Design a protein with these regions (language model features):
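Alpha-helical transmembrane segments and their helix-entry boundary regions
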Residues: 83, 94-95, 155, 169-170, ...
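Helix-boundary and loop/linker segments of multi-pass membrane transporters
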Residues: 5-9, 86-89, 125-132, 161-164, ...
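Juxtamembrane helix-entry segments on the extracytoplasmic side of multipass membrane proteins
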Residues: 124-137, 204-213, 217-221
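Residue-level signature of the transmembrane alpha-helical core
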Residues: 95, 99, 103, 138, ...
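Helix-capping/transition residues at the boundaries of transmembrane alpha-helices
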Residues: 72, 113, 161, 234-235
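Functional transmembrane helices that form membrane-embedded active or gating regions
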Residues: 167, 233-250, 311-313
């Protein structure tokens, strides 16, 4: 695969994603057929049929993991390893700094929503349930943060950044990151019989939200700003851990916010999100994310020149 070796790493990522999607479309109908067989013949193992959208999502995860294991040497090169293999003290400091900034910004947003009557604070769950929710949310936050930071910042953004056009890197990588979050499968339905090509129309239907793009714009913009801050964290520190902490902290906070209260209405307004994803699509959230970016700037000011020089040296 000499052509793959000569290809810039961010282009390898695009081809990898296309390959994962193609493999998902091929195997998902057969996985759905197998799941239906289990539900029919072994109800003790699988009590009910699984909608095809869920099967497709699991097939995507399986395809991604398998192909990444097989092709990992084309993505995890020396430059990527240097973003991960840092001293434990540095990694832990950056990780917990990111977590603190992200959770702190979400607490401030929750206070603002409480003051404006959008959020009512109260303890909705028992202590044991709350602790269980915290644990699962933290595991989800760290795993999602680590994977997305590796792919979108470590590979895609850094690949573009290393080519010298930094503005293009910030815009292209994070626009791709934000738009990709709105590629969603259609409504739940079940496959009847063997339909070997069912995965391909299902994939096409996942792009249906873009037929009405205007409601998506606030959410896309909010995720774009998040991507900018996470990319800036990579440039300022020269590693992925501050970004993983920020990313994981935001995911953790969103998943646990309703443990401590509930929203008083469905539409959170222009300040906190009138469209999905709620909160991320709100103007107040955009400002809080930018403030986190400012905090990243000042907290890393003693390391910034050294990290920038290091990134530039690795790109040459």
């Amino acid at each position: 695969m000499k052509f793959f070796d000569a290809m810039p790493i961010h282009r390898r990522l695009i081809l990898f994603l296309l390959a994962v999607l193609a493999l998902t479309c091929v195997i998902s109908p057969w996985l759905a057929l197998g799941a239906d067989w289990l539900a029919t013949h072994w109800p003790a193992l699988l009590s009910e049929r699984i909608p095809f959208s869920r099967v497709f999502n699991r097939a995507f995860m399986i395809s991604g993991v398998v192909l990444f294991i097989l092709l990992r040497r084309y993505f995890i090169d020396g430059r990527i390893k240097e973003l991960i293999a840092v001293r434990f003290a540095v990694a832990s400091r950056d990780l917990f700094t990111g977590l603190g900034l992200a959770v702190g910004s979400m607490i401030l947003l929750a206070v603002a929503m409480t003051v404006t009557g959008i959020f009512t604070p109260f303890m909705r769950a028992s202590l044991s349930h709350a602790l269980e929710r915290f644990f699962t949310a933290m595991m989800a936050g760290i795993s999602v943060g680590a994977l997305e930071e590796l792919f979108f910042r470590g590979i895609l953004f850094k690949g573009l950044h290393d080519q010298g056009n930094r503005l293009r890197a910030y815009i292209a990588a994070n626009l791709f990151y934000s738009v990709l979050h709105f590629v969603k499968p259609g409504e739940d339905y079940f496959l009847d019989g063997t339909l070997p090509l069912a995965g391909f129309p299902h994939l096409i239907s996942a792009f249906s939200p873009f037929l009405d793009p205007l409601p998506l714009l606030p959410g896309i913009f909010g995720l774009f700003i998040i991507g900018l801050v996470l990319s800036y964290a990579l440039v300022r520190t020269g590693n992925l851990y501050l970004g993983i902490g920020l990313h994981g902290g935001w995911v953790f906070s969103l998943k646990t916010m309703r443990v401590f209260g509930n929203f008083t209405r469905e539409d959170l307004g222009w300040a906190f999100g009138a469209t999905d994803p709620k909160i991320v699509s709100g103007v107040a959230t955009w400002l809080s994310i930018l403030l986190v970016g400012v905090a990243v700037h000042f907290l890393t000011r003693k390391r910034a020149d050294r990290s920038a020089d290091s990134l530039h040296a690795k790109a040459v």
